[in-house]
Swiss-Prot record:
Zn(2+) binds at H80, H239, D243. The active site is at H266 (proton donor). This is UDP-3-O-acyl-N-acetylglucosamine deacetylase. It catalyses: a UDP-3-O-[(3R)-3-hydroxyacyl]-N-acetyl-alpha-D-glucosamine + H2O = a UDP-3-O-[(3R)-3-hydroxyacyl]-alpha-D-glucosamine + acetate. Belongs to the LpxC family. The keyword Repeat does not apply. It comes from the Bacteria. It comes from Blochmanniella floridana. Its EC number is 3.5.1.108. NCBIfam families: lpxC (TIGR00325).
Amino acid sequence: MIKQRTLKNIVCTTGIGLHTGQEVTLTLYPALANTGIIYRRIDLNPPVDFCVNIESVGSTFLCTCLKNNTYGVQVLTVEHLSAAQSGLGIDNIIIELNGPEVPIMDGSADPFVSLLLKAGIKELNSSKNFFRLKQIVRVEDGDRWAELRPFNGFTLDFTIDYDHPVVNMKNKHYFFNFTSKSFRSEISSARTFGFVDNIQKLKNCGFVLGGSLTSSVVMDKYQVVNSEGLRFNNELVRHKILDAVGDLFMCGYNLIGSFIGFKSGHTLNNKLLRAVLARRKAWEITSCIQGCDVSKIF
């Protein structure tokens, strides 16, 4: 068994919200064992807390949001920071922000991984719990689908399917065997992406107001617009895996199981997690994973 983790020190950063376009300061605090992941909006009076669990997930249109039904407010775009926390196996943290949205940074989880490592990781004197799959659960939406199945480890198998010259048979699929080390080297730096035609339509509707070439991969009808190009030939599908890592962390624990997704996104990932939780025999919270050395994963 391994121990729960939190931060050693307080750290902060400032950035722009992808959808709101607002500047926001993010401050991360250590937390006691069994606190869980708590987001706190201090721009509101009184400050409002959002505890990470599946029932707290609100809108999943274009991003994953957490809601507080008591106050009727949300915190937007938590998935990249959540992926970074999951990637480093952090169980307990308080995240203060002075605005409605987690900053987009460079469009990946890498700046958040660096921020968390700058704070330092501290072990607590309590066993780490995991969300372990015991049965296969699958959800579908037209030709899109997502599935979780039992596995003594954590793997993600993802396929995208865009009718675009940048996407081809060689870079539309990726299989990822999750460890903290492999997450940092293979997944965390993959950036969010969009298409020029869609971006202007979304801006007209009040979304992606903070989007830019420094915070996402942008493609016109033929190619990547960013002068630096892609970080990986298959950066797009790697980012979809990053999103899935963050979305699955909405259960509040690191997951032990195998995820398979075909054209899945935030909404279907959330639907899958809710379908799993609705089947009580399909999962368990446990600190002991027989047949799996979790110390090699985290």
